């Protein structure tokens, strides 16, 4: 997957650059994917329903393809999500995933934990420690941990 700068679309980056840098220092722009792949409906229509980790793996795979092997991605997801969120019916055809079942009871358990585990993966062979600095209103820092 290729990522582009929100302030200069001629700037391209790979997933590692996007996640480790967060933003383009020259422009101040954020990196975003150049495309947003659709999740195959056959995954969501399985009976029994796929686990949260299975869905997370299939959602993340196109964004990291060529940079994180499948077995490493599965390990990152297992480490980031050692909990199973609840999906509850809202009505006959709609469901809601409750985002307060992670370790900090905050929605950030779902995004921040994956980001931190991915950054740790890319830093695993480096000689310098990885420090993630977050601005927080209270739940972000603990979700990254």
Show where each model-derived region lies.
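PLP-dependent amino-acid enzyme catalytic core
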Residues: 1-145
């Amino acid at each position: 997957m290729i990522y582009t700068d929100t302030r200069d679309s001629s700037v391209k980056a790979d997933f590692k650059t996007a996640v480790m840098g967060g933003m383009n220092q020259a422009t101040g722009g954020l990196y975003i994917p150049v495309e947003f792949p659709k999740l195959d409906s056959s995954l969501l229509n399985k009976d029994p329903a796929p686990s949260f980790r299975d869905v997370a793996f299939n959602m993340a795979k196109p964004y990291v393809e060529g940079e994180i092997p499948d077995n490493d991605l599965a390990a990152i997801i297992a480490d980031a999500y050692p909990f199973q969120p609840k999906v509850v019916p809202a009505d006959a055809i709609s469901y809601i995933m409750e985002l307060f079942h992670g370790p900090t009871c905050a929605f950030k358990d779902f995004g921040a934990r994956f980001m931190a585990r991915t950054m740790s993966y890319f830093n695993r062979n480096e000689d310098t420690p990885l420090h993630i600095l977050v601005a927080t209103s209270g739940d972000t820092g603990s979700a990254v941990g």
